[in-house]
Amino acid sequence: MKRTFQPSVIKRARTHGFRARMATKNGRKVLAARRAKGRKRLAV
């Protein structure tokens, strides 16, 4: 059985990156929530 996690920096950034979050309304909600919580890193 192959391992399901095959790391790729590009894929990671495209799906979970800052610009990906900013692109949708809900993504912006995620960032707002993380800012409110005081997260050091808002996105990957």
From Swiss-Prot:
Biological process (GO), any one: translation
Gene Ontology CC terms, in alphabetical order: ribonucleoprotein complex; ribosome
GO molecular-function terms, A-Z: structural constituent of ribosome
Pfam families xref list: Ribosomal_L34
Ribonucleoprotein found in the keyword field: yes
InterPro entries linked to this entry: Ribosomal_bL34, Ribosomal_bL34_CS
Keywords, in A-Z order: Ribonucleoprotein, Ribosomal protein
Family indicated by similarity: Belongs to the bacterial ribosomal protein bL34 family.
Family annotation (HAMAP family): Ribosomal_bL34 (MF_00391)
Protein name: Large ribosomal subunit protein bL34
